[in-house]
């Protein structure tokens, strides 16, 4: 039998596993491509170990997942970022452009070849040179969040 804390943790793992399953399916549906995930692992490990940064947020714009590469890129830990607003990743000067971009993703389902400036937790700016951002949809075709995979970035 699980203690209350362990049961909560298992529930969270199941919840993120389901979200990542929808993220993977949505990526393929929108882009006609596959995410570069290792096939011989469970889904969470495949996302976690992907060499490219992958992050997602829920329908309200709060981070619900970052893989190891994304945590490293943004210089954060999961405890520092999960449940926090994704606005923290863009400098104030880029917020208007960021909002415009997310609205385009809402309208079109995804955007390829995204470029934009982002900021790490210690204030260092970097340029995303190539990324895909897509809507994550559930089995009933309801939008449940958005996700990004970053193919290339450079320090500024």
Language-model segments: residues:
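Sensory/regulatory domains in signal-transduction proteins
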Residues: 46-156
């Amino acid at each position: 039998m699980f203690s209350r804390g362990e049961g909560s943790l298992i529930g969270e793992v199941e919840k993120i596993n389901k979200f990542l399953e929808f993220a993977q399916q949505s990526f393929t549906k929108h882009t006609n491509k596959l995410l570069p995930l290792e096939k011989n692992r469970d889904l969470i490990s495949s996302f976690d170990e992907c060499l490219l940064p992958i992050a997602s947020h829920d329908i309200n714009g709060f981070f619900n997942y970052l893989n190891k590469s994304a945590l490293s890129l943004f210089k954060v830990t999961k405890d520092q970022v999960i449940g926090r607003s994704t606005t923290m990743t863009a400098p104030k000067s880029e917020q208007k452009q960021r909002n415009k971009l997310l609205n385009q993703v809402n309208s079109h389902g995804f955007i390829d070849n995204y470029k934009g400036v982002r900021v790490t937790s210690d204030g260092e700016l970097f340029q995303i040179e190539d990324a895909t951002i897509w809507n994550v949809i559930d089995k009933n075709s309801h939008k449940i969040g958005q996700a990004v995979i970053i193919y290339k970035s450079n320090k500024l």
